[in-house]
Swiss-Prot record:
Temperature-activity note from the record: Optimum temperature is 10 degrees Celsius. Above 65 degrees Celsius no activity is detected.
Residues that hold NAD(+) according to the record: 11-12, 33, 119, 181, 314
Reactions the enzyme catalyzes: D-glyceraldehyde 3-phosphate + phosphate + NAD(+) = (2R)-3-phospho-glyceroyl phosphate + NADH + H(+)
Main location: cytoplasm
Residue pairs linked by disulfide bridges in the UniProt entry: none
pH note: Optimum pH is 9.3. Above pH 10, stability decreases rapidly.
EC code: 1.2.1.12
Enzyme class: oxidoreductase
Gene3D superfamilies: Dihydrodipicolinate Reductase, domain 2, NAD(P)-binding Rossmann-like Domain
Assembly description: Homotetramer.
Protein's recorded name: Glyceraldehyde-3-phosphate dehydrogenase
Keyword NAD annotated: yes
């Protein structure tokens, strides 16, 4: 049984606990977050986007009791001071968003943990993993890895199929993305000085940047320099879609594209021909759900523009992939 600690009990940290409770061989034994434990337990139990937690949680001195099992709760700002060695922590799931550099994340290792998985994009000095795309790049000797971003986890399986089967010359991706807590609920100064994210999240379509297209090269090196992209934040709390417009090396048909995607489907990469909307993907465990009804091809002067699209729950889809990576990393650890 691998012992897991979660550092940062926000949107991803709380959903990670839900998922880990369903995964044999993993046990969350500790959580670290600076927020009051009573508040954390309430936010874990009641979730506006993902629904109520079906199990039981109660707060006691210095701990939660989740489905009858005690989970220690700490409120320590410096990860290096956490008792990971005493608790025998195998892997820390780093979900604060603050310790995304290798040196900073290694504070958990210095505190006694064996491994760290960062729930965010990280630097080029770390392996960036999208499960069922490049997790076999891991050999178990790594101490810190990145689970990439929610959008990279959506884009990578679709891009891999296109590149493996037909070859990608170049492409541009757009994620139509739910709003997140780095936006304002009402107009006001943004903490990072972003004039667009300073505007009310639930009122407008808000253009934003995304690193997913460039980060894809950390997952699929053959795509380095071939993709770019942007994001459009829209007024829904979760449920997003990524569109990829590509120029391929081979002439293709819609049927060939869809057949290739269907053949590649697995636990991480779903396939649907249903006319779904974003509300239908809230809570799914696929990291990416390919929508065959949205595949389009335009022939232009002997060349083709190929548009493909995949849905994802930017919260639960990503968390499910993150936990798969976590479980695999714990299993192969050396």
């Amino acid at each position: 049984m691998a012992k897991i600690a979660i550092n940062g009990f926000g949107r991803i940290g709380r959903l990670a606990l839900r998922r880990i409770l369903e995964v044999p061989g993993l046990e969350v034994v500790a959580i670290n977050d600076l927020t009051d434990a009573k508040m954390l337990a309430h936010l874990f139990k009641y979730d506006s986007s993902q629904g109520r937690f079906n199990g039981e949680i109660e707060v006691k001195e210095g701990a939660f009791v989740v489905n009858g099992k005690e989970v220690k709760v700490f409120a320590e700002a410096d990860p290096e001071k956490l008792p990971w060695g005493d608790l025998g922590i195998d892997v820390v799931l780093e979900c604060t968003g603050f310790f995304t550099k290798k040196e900073k994340a290694e504070a958990h290792v210095r505190a006694g943990a064996k491994k760290v998985v960062i729930s965010a994009p990280a630097g080029n000095d770390l392996k960036t993993i999208v499960f069922n795309v490049n997790n076999e790049d891991l050999d178990g000797t790594e101490t810190v890895i990145s689970g990439a971003s929610c959008t990279t986890n959506c884009l990578a399986p679709m891009a891999k199929v296109l590149n493996d089967k037909f070859g990608i010359e170049k492409g541009f991706m757009t994620t139509i993305h739910a709003f997140t807590n780095d936006q304002n609920t009402l107009d006001g100064p943004h903490r990072k000085g972003d004039l667009r994210r300073a505007r009310a999240a639930a009122v407008s379509i808000i253009p934003n940047s995304t690193g997913a297209a460039k980060a894809i090269s950390q997952v699929i090196p053959d795509l380095a320099g071939k993709l770019d992209g942007n994001a459009q934040r829209v007024p829904v709390p979760t449920g997003s879609i990524t569109e990829l417009v590509s120029v391929l090396k081979k002439k293709v048909t819609v049927e060939e594209i869809n057949a290739a995607m269907k053949e590649a489907a697995d636990e991480s990469f779903g396939y649907t021909e249903d006319p779904i909307v974003s509300a239908d993907v809230v809570g799914i465990n696929y990291g990416s759900l390919f929508d065959a009804t949205l595949t389009k091809i335009v022939d232009v002067n002997g060349s083709q523009l190929v548009k493909t699209a995949a849905w994802y729950d930017n919260e639960m889809s990503y968390t499910s992939q993150l936990v798969r990576t976590l479980a695999y990393f714990a299993k192969i650890a050396k």
